[in-house]
Amino acid sequence: MTDSLIAIVPAAGVGQRAGRPDLPKQYRLLAGQPMLRWAVAALLADARIGQVRVAVSPGDERAGAALAGLPRTVCRPCGGPTRAATVAAALADSNAADSDWILVHDAARPGLPPDALARLIDACLADAVGGLLALPVADTVKAGGPRVRATLDRDGLWLAQTPQMFRAGVLRAALAAAQAGGGTVTDEASAIEAAGHAPLLVPGAMRNFKVTWPDDFELMEKWL
């Protein structure tokens, strides 16, 4: 029997940098649809993903309307105070077997193209650890603020994207260990790394950027 592929979209945040404190950014409209709907639909484009589980904050009254009519989609009020807590809760809520594959995708990455998603799944299914979409750093990188302290060597540096795809058992254990240790987990791959694994880097796509700042909304609309 083929192991299941389950996607998790943590959508319990508010997006404080996006310029609309009255509306969480995942519900802001892009080309006429909530950003969250675009992100979930991008995952549903690959038939190998059996289910997309969206984790929202308890009491969230917007998610139902934003996701109405989408197939293979489950919305659960299991969002936590941090991304790691939300993903861990969604993973527990899914009852996924340890051998199932979990793809975690940002609600703020609505521009995920089908070919990048397929590339990630193909690569990870053939890998012992799993991996993530990422892009090699192209710009010169400076450290400092407000003045330059140093120019960093960009050779070998990658910008992490999502989805990030790992076996449920491995991810569950890595997140639990990271939370118990009190460290900051900014993405699933960092928890996997802390557990001693080396995730695979799979080339992503420029249009799969994370909508973060007010100007990003206009830019993303050009892609959708």
Curated annotation (Swiss-Prot):
Instruction: Identify the enzyme class.
Output: transferase
Q: Which UniProt keywords apply?
A: Isoprene biosynthesis, Nucleotidyltransferase, Transferase
Q: Is Nucleotidyltransferase there in the keyword field?
A: yes
Q: Where is this site: Positions MEP for the nucleophilic attack?
A: R154, K210
Query: Key word Nucleotidyltransferase present in the record?
Result: yes
Report which reactions are catalysed by this protein. 2-C-methyl-D-erythritol 4-phosphate + CTP + H(+) = 4-CDP-2-C-methyl-D-erythritol + diphosphate
Q: In which pathway does it act?
A: Isoprenoid biosynthesis; isopentenyl diphosphate biosynthesis via DXP pathway; isopentenyl diphosphate from 1-deoxy-D-xylulose 5-phosphate: step 2/6
Q: Which Gene3D superfamilies match?
A: Spore Coat Polysaccharide Biosynthesis Protein SpsA, Chain A
Matches recorded under InterPro entries: IspD, IspD/TarI, IspD/TarI_cytidylyltransf_bact, ISPD_synthase_CS, Nucleotide-diphossugar_trans
The residues annotated as site (Transition state stabilizer) are: R17, K25
Molecular functions (GO terms): 2-C-methyl-D-erythritol 4-phosphate cytidylyltransferase activity
One Pfam family this sequence matches: IspD
- Under Enzyme Commission nomenclature, its number is 2.7.7.60
Superkingdom of this protein's organism: Bacteria
GO BP, one annotated term: isopentenyl diphosphate biosynthetic process, methylerythritol 4-phosphate pathway
- Report the function annotation for this chain: Catalyzes the formation of 4-diphosphocytidyl-2-C-methyl-D-erythritol from CTP and 2-C-methyl-D-erythritol 4-phosphate (MEP).
The record's family statement is: Belongs to the IspD/TarI cytidylyltransferase family. IspD subfamily.
PANTHER family recorded for this chain? 2-C-METHYL-D-ERYTHRITOL 4-PHOSPHATE CYTIDYLYLTRANSFERASE, CHLOROPLASTIC
Annotated protein name in UniProt:
2-C-methyl-D-erythritol 4-phosphate cytidylyltransferase
